[in-house]
Amino acid sequence: MTQQQAQTHVATEGDREIVTERVFDAPRERVFQAFVDPELIPQWWGRRADTTTVDKMDVREGGEWRFVTDGPDGNTAFRGVYRAVEPPERLEQTFEWEGMPGHIVVETATFEDLGDGRTKVSTRSLFHTTEERDGMLASGMEIGLGESYEQLDELLAAGAAVD
């Protein structure tokens, strides 16, 4: 299964994974910074109709993160633990929607310097079961991810992230 949301490529791999790719028109260091800076996260993370608040963001191995989104459908929270932080190449973390506690996903994001001022971000999300993976896809995550990445494009174009 392969689907396209804006320029974000989303595919399933194996029985329990979702793999995404997106190319950003910015150097790798700037893109990585946007993923780890608590002041930048609220400017791009989540759907356009939502407001994101960073409740906790301790970007180090073993550090915790928690984001709360508030929008037309109410508020919800997501949380996890950073398992690996390797600037500007790789982030690995757990991801859990507090509305379904115990369904923890392991997400690995890699940041590839394409050599022309652009960066490819690839994420691999590993679920416990095929049903959990398929439930995430059915939840509208592709729309939310697409909107988030569009907002990140805009943020990077405005020069908001650190060089």
PLM segments and residue spans:
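Hydrophobic ligand-binding cavity/cleft-lining segments
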Residues: 1-50
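Short beta-edge strand/loop motif at the mouth of beta-sheet-based domains
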Residues: 19, 39-77, 162-163
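Hydrophobic pocket/interface hotspot
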Residues: 31-35, 41, 65-67, 82, ...
